[in-house]
């Protein structure tokens, strides 16, 4: 779930806003956005493109949660429909797998390191996926 924060029709740019803590903002400035953030903004761009918008670029503005406006940073790249399509294909595969095998198949599916803390299904330490998701397992192969 999410919504497009900003679309600049003149430049064809979809922009997402993120409010980050000091550590996350420092990492964003050094390494750019996470794969999850990048994919998210490309998905938003795909939605706009399907509704008729002329999308050419995506961008993320990272704002400091506790700092000043001057601490904000902006990242951008060309719109990549393939990135969004790969995400949608993975979602379809997950739906098919759980449709055939049930939700008990979820622990068998590799996860990506993500921002689980903000997910409504995240419950650290849960062992029954019928109840919730324990989040990314860094030890899983």
What are these regions (language model features)?
Residues 30-38:
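Active-site metal-coordination segments of metallo-dependent hydrolases
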Residues 37-49:
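An active-site-proximal "capping" alpha-helix that borders the catalytic cofactor pocket
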Residues 46-141:
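Metal-dependent nuclease catalytic regions and adjoining charged, substrate-binding loops involved
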């Amino acid at each position: 779930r999410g919504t497009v924060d900003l679309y600049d029709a003149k430049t064809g740019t979809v922009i997402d806003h993120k409010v980050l803590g000091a550590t996350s903002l420092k990492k964003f400035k050094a390494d750019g956005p996470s794969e999850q953030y990048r994919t998210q903004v490309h998905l938003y761009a795909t939605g706009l493109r399907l509704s008729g918008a002329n999308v050419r670029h995506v961008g993320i503005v990272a704002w400091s949660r506790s700092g000043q406006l001057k601490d904000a940073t902006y990242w951008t790249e060309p719109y990549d429909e393939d990135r969004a399509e790969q995400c949608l294909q993975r979602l379809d595969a997950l739906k098919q797998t759980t449709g055939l095998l049930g939700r008990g198949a979820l622990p068998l599916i590799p996860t990506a390191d993500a921002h689980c803390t903000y997910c409504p299904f995240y419950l650290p330490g849960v062992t029954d996926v019928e109840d919730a998701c324990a989040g990314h397992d860094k030890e899983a192969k």
